[in-house]
Design a protein with these regions (language model features):
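N-terminal capping segment at the start of a domain
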Residues: 2-38, 127, 383-385
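Active-site-adjacent substrate-binding region
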Residues: 9, 23-24, 162-212, 250-255, ...
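Zn-dependent metallopeptidase/amidohydrolase metal-coordination segment
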Residues: 15-21, 84-85, 281, 352-402
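A non-catalytic alpha/beta surface segment that caps or lines the substrate-entry region
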Residues: 27-72
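A short beta-alpha structural unit
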Residues: 33-37, 267-275, 286-293, 318-337
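Alpha-helical metal-binding/catalytic segments enriched in His/Glu/Asp
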Residues: 83-85, 92-130, 218-224, 230-256, ...
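Midchain, well-structured core segments that form catalytic/ion-binding scaffolds
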Residues: 128-129, 133-295
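His/Asp/Glu-rich mid-to-C-terminal helical/loop segments that flank catalytic regions of hydrolases
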Residues: 214, 230, 234-259, 306, ...
C-alpha cells in the first residue's frame, strides 16, 4: 500500500515530537535517565497510554509494569501479533533507543481498523530492557515470555531497595506477576523496529536493515584483589597492585575480542581504597561480552579466564567472578524476517541489507514464547546510549511504511476471522 507522502510526513512529525516529549521525563535534571518502576516510568507510560488510546487501542498495564495496547482482529480474542520496544533508558541516554520503536508501533497500529486483520495487533511498551536500576536486563519482556527468575526479587538498586519492594511501591503485586505471562497459542509473533546502534547502515548508505539475529551476551562482575600499601614505601617487586592487574586484563579483553570477532567492553571500574597515595588493594569492574554465536562468545570468556589466572600468578593477586546476566544468541524467524524484508522492499530498497544485532533487544526474551523479527533504522554515525543519538525524519518515514507493510505481509498469509 502506497501512503500519501503528506500523511506520512505528518505522522513522522508527530513521532519525532513525541520522542522529544518523552525525553523530558527524566529522573535527572541535566540528562535523560528513566528507570524501571520509578515515577518517571509511570509518567512516560501515562503518555504512551494516551497515544495508544488515540490510535484506537484498548490499554492496560500488565502485572510486570509493561504498558499494552490492543486492536482486535476479525473476531474478538484472536491471537496477537506483538509490536513493541522499551521506554526505559541508560543514564545520560539518547531519545530514540527503544522509544522510537514504541512510537512507530503505535503509529502503525493507528493505520489499521478494528476487525481488519486476521489477528489482533498489540503494542507493548516494555518497562525494563536496559537493566539500569537493578542490573538485570529484559525484565519486562522476560515477564511476558514467562521466563521470569524469582531470584530477581532479591536484587537491590543503588538505594538498597529490593525489586520486590519496588514492585509494591509502584502499586504492583509480586504475587500476581504470572498474570503477565503469555502462552504461545496467544501469539502470532513479535516485530520490533529499533535504531541500529551501529554504523553499518550509514556506511552502506541505506535507511533500513533486516536483522538476521541478535547477539548472545554475557555480563560479569569481576574482582582483582591484592594488598593495599604505601605508594612511596612499597618497592615494585613487593607490590600486589590490583589495578595494574585489572588494567592488564582490560587490554586482554580488547585483544581477545578482536582475535575472536567478539565484542568485549569494560564499562565500569571501581578502585579501593581509592587514596592518591595508596596502592590499590582491590578493583571491582564489569565485563560485557557478546558475539553473533554463543560458542565464540564462550570461547572468548574461557581465554580471558586463563589470562586472569596468569595475571594472578605473576602479580600475587586473586580473581573473583560472578556472572550477572546471560542471554543466548537468537535467530530471527525466517517467515517474519521475510515479512520485514518485503516491507523494506516496498519502500524502494530492492535488496535489503542483512545485519546481526550487536546490541541486545527485547526480542531475545520474547523468542522464548513466539517467533520474532526486527527492522533496523539508520542512526547518525551509529551513536547510541548517548545524548547525540540522532535519526533522520526521512528514515523514520521509510521505517513507518516498511513496518506497516511487514504487518500486512504477515496478515496476507492468514485468513480473516
Amino acid at each position: 500500500m502506497r501512503r500519501d507522502r503528506d500523511v506520512t510526513a505528518a505522522e513522522v512529525d508527530l513521532i519525532m515530537t513525541r520522542c522529544d516529549e518523552l525525553a523530558t521525563i527524566s529522573s535527572h535534571p541535566d540528562y535523560l535517565e528513566r528507570v524501571h518502576l520509578s515515577p518517571e516510568h509511570r509518567a512516560a507510560h501515562d503518555l504512551v497510554e494516551g497515544w495508544m488510546q488515540g490510535a484506537g487501542m484498548s490499554t492496560w498495564m500488565d502485572a510486570a509494569g509493561n504498558r499494552v495496547g490492543r486492536i482486535e482482529g476479525g473476531s474478538p480474542g484472536l491471537p496477537a501479533l506483538l509490536l513493541g520496544s522499551h521506554t526505559d533508558t541508560v543514564p545520560d541516554a539518547g531519545r530514540y533507543d527503544g522509544m522510537l520503536g514504541v512510537l512507530l508501533a503505535i503509529a502503525v497500529a493507528g493505520r489499521f481498523r478494528p476487525g481488519e486483520l486476521p489477528f489482533a495487533l498489540e503494542v507493548v511498551a516494555f518497562s525494563d530492557e536496559e537493566g539500569t536500576r537493578f542490573g538485570t536486563a529484559l525484565m519486562g519482556s522476560r515477564a511476558l515470555a514467562g521466563t521470569w527468575d524469582d531470584d530477581w526479587w532479591r536484587l537491590t538498586d543503588a538505594d538498597g531497595i529490593t525489586l520486590f519492594e519496588a514492585f509494591q511501591d509502584f502499586g504492583l503485586d509480586p504475587a500476581r506477576l504470572p498474570g503477565a505471562f503469555r502462552r504461545p497459542e496467544q501469539l502470532v509473533g513479535y516485530l520490533e523496529a529499533h535504531i541500529e546502534q551501529g554504523p553499518y547502515l550509514q556506511d552502506a548508505d541505506r535507511r533500513l536493515g533486516l536483522v538476521t539475529s541478535i547477539a548472545g551476551a554475557r555480563r560479569f562482575a569481576l574482582t582483582f584483589t591484592g594488598h593495599a600499601g604505601h605508594a612511596g614505601g612499597t618497592p615494585f617487586d613487593r607490590r600486589r597492585d590490583a589495578l595494574v592487574g585489572a588494567s592488564e586484563f582490560v587490554i586482554a579483553v580488547e585483544a581477545a575480542s578482536k582475535n575472536h570477532g567478539t565484542i568485549g567492553t569494560v564499562g565500569k571500574l571501581e578502585v579501593f581504597p581509592g587514596g592518591v597515595n595508596v596502592i590499590p588493594g582491590r578493583v571491582e569492574f564489569s565485563l560485557d561480552l557478546r558475539a553473533e554465536h554463543d560458542v565464540i562468545r564462550d570461547a572468548t570468556w574461557a581465554e580471558l579466564e586463563a589470562v586472569a589466572v596468569d595475571i594472578c600468578r605473576r602479580r600475587g593477586l586473586t580473581f573473583g567472578t560472578r556472572e550477572i546476566y546471560r542471554a543466548d544468541a537468537v535467530a530471527c524467524d525466517p517467515f517474519l524476517a521475510e515479512a520485514i524484508a518485503s516491507g523494506i522492499r516496498s519502500t524502494g530498497d530492492v535488496d535489503p541489507v542483512p545485519l546481526w544485532s550487536r546490541a541486545g533487544h527485547d526480542g531475545m526474551a520474547i523468542a522464548a514464547v513466539t517467533p520474532i523479527a526486527m527492522l533496523f533504522i539508520r542512526c547518525l554515525d551509529g551513536i547510541s546510549h548517548h545524548p547525540d543519538e540522532s535519526v533522520q525524519p526521512a528514515d523514520v518515514a521509510a521505517a513507518l511504511d516498511a513496518f506497516e507493510a511487514a504487518v500486512r505481509a504477515v496478515a496476507a498469509t492468514l485468513p480473516v476471522g
